[in-house]
């Protein structure tokens, strides 16, 4: 078997079904993975164009328009999605139900597992791998692995690392949404911590305190609503 056929057989594939108004009516587990999503609720009932960033929407619209054409050919395009480059093949459907399109998604290119080996554990698709620092003409970055905790700073935030703290132009709510929830947890309305950098837990009457792995052993408060969840994650 040649390399192309071998890679094609191993490539991750998924399927999306769309109604005539281009809302998603069904999704396969493979499609969720390729789109960098965990649950179908994030897709079902939503217009397919709204699920893509603005620069990609015209390309998706042309893809569907071509598939809907008089000759009804399957239309193809390669898009860079959160899970990586994906070949999308769109076909118009005819039937009694509400489904009007089938989109077949196939991962293209070498997988990270192939490049780095099966033991590598990449960050889930769509999550930040670096956090931006500073404001102005130059933006620097810190790897998420180096982030110890994040603190709200008005409409922005402050990133704490082993080397001190720096301004981040992203709001804490956006960071919560874009960081891997297996690695980061919002423990208080003003704080997100990297679970790998929690040094100790201190009880107190209301909530608790986390001792973080900084030189000074910074203390981060825990909101009462997060105490039970945090105890489970830290096995305490």
Curated annotation (Swiss-Prot):
Pfam families: LytTR. It comes from the Bacteria. One of its GO terms (molecular function) is phosphorelay response regulator activity. Its cofactor is heme. The keyword Iron applies. Keywords: Activator, DNA-binding, Heme, Iron, Metal-binding, Nitrogen fixation, Transcription, Transcription regulation. Residues 1-64 form the PAS domain. Residues 131-236 form the HTH LytTR-type domain. One of its GO terms (biological process) is regulation of nitrogen utilization. Gene3D superfamilies: LytTr DNA-binding domain, PAS domain. Binds 1 heme group per subunit. Heme binds at residue 52. CDD domains: PAS (cd00130). InterPro entries: LytR-like, LytTR_DNA-bd_dom, PAS, PAS-like_dom_sf. Disruption phenotype: Strains lacking this gene are not able to grow with N(2) as a nitrogen source in the presence of CO. SMART domains: LytTR. Activates the expression of the CowN protein in response to carbon monoxide (CO). Is required to sustain N(2)-dependent growth in the presence of low levels of carbon monoxide (CO). PANTHER family: STAGE 0 SPORULATION PROTEIN A HOMOLOG, TRANSCRIPTIONAL REGULATOR-RELATED. The N-terminal sensor (heme-containing) domain is covalently linked to the C-terminal, DNA-binding response domain. This is CO-responsive transcriptional regulator RcoM.
């Amino acid at each position: 078997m040649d390399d192309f056929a071998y890679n094609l057989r191993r490539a991750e594939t998924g399927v999306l079904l769309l109604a005539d108004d281009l809302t998603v009516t069904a999704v396969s587990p493979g499609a969720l993975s390729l789109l960098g999503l965990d649950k179908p609720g994030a897709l079902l009932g939503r217009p397919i164009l709204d699920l893509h960033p603005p620069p990609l929407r015209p390309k998706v619209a042309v893809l569907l328009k071509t598939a809907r054409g008089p000759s009804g050919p399957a239309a193809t395009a390669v898009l860079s999605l959160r899970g990586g480059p994906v070949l999308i093949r769109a076909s118009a459907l005819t039937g009694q139900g509400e489904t009007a399109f089938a989109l077949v998604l196939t991962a293209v290119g070498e997988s990270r597992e192939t490049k780095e080996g099966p033991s590598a554990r990449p960050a889930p698709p769509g999550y930040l791998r670096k956090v931006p620092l500073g404001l102005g003409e130059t933006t620097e970055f810190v790897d998420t692995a180096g982030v110890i905790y994040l603190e709200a700073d008005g409409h922005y935030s402050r990133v704490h690392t082993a080397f001190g703290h720096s301004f981040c132009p992203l709001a804490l709510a956006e960071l919560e949404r874009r960081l891997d929830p297996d690695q980061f947890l919002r423990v208080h309305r003003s704080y997100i911590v990297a679970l790998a950098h929690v040094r100790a837990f201190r009880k107190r009457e209301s909530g608790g305190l986390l001792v973080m792995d900084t030189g000074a052993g910074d203390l981060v408060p825990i909101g009462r609503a997060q105490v039970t969840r945090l105890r489970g994650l830290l096995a305490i």
